[in-house]
Amino acid sequence: MRDVSITLQIENWAQRTFESQDGSSRVVRSGDVMDPTGRCRLTAWCDFDPTPGDSIRIEGGRVQFWQGSPDLVIDSLEQVSSLSDSPWEKIDPENHWVEVGLTEITQGGSRRGISTSGTIVAINSGSGIIERCPECRRMLRDGSCTEHGAQRGVEDLRLRFVLDDGVSNANLFLGKESAEEFLGMKMDKIKSEISSIGKEVFVSNLRRRVLARKMAVHGRCAVDGQGAMLFADKVELVESKPAEEAEMVMQKWEVVL
């Protein structure tokens, strides 16, 4: 998609230098941007260095996909300008999540900065300490990467659940930081606990804690031919209110007692 015009607020910004295929050094700048409808990544192939919190206007930008999510790209400074006044009240990045129903997520495209909820209906037995390929970060299976063969893996922490809203479901992944926050323990302590009680007991304890519980999720989603995946920045268990939930079901299905 080309000729994109949009107003955005900068959340963060960084640059990195890399070696291109012809051997020359190139600089790419990128960061997270947002507006009241959500957030995405912005990549600049030009000397553009905004400050977090700045409001900008893009004219003639383009969209590309990175890790399944649409990202904005500008190729020259002529495509972007700084705004002295924001068209909306300053957005707080820590609390900026767009509420989207789980079924809507599964039927839509990949996006960032979303908040959704559902019931945990399954816990993957591979949850806990895993090993990743040092080359591509894929999860190793029996010490082997599907892309790079046998590898000495790098340990990581991952929890994997299935979230369901009664109509649709999605795989939910908690990476190291979000898993540590949810479990209330650092990775080293979790590793020690698994070594002490065993992987099966660890997963069993996790099932007792979350299975059939409602969970609120904040993060990003990726949707492809294999279904929907949620990658959580943070999660929290939601205390159920049976009377209110029963009333909602009765209203939805027009039940009269």
Task: Give the location of each predicted region.
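Single-stranded nucleic acid-binding proteins centered on OB/S1-type folds
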Residues: 1-257
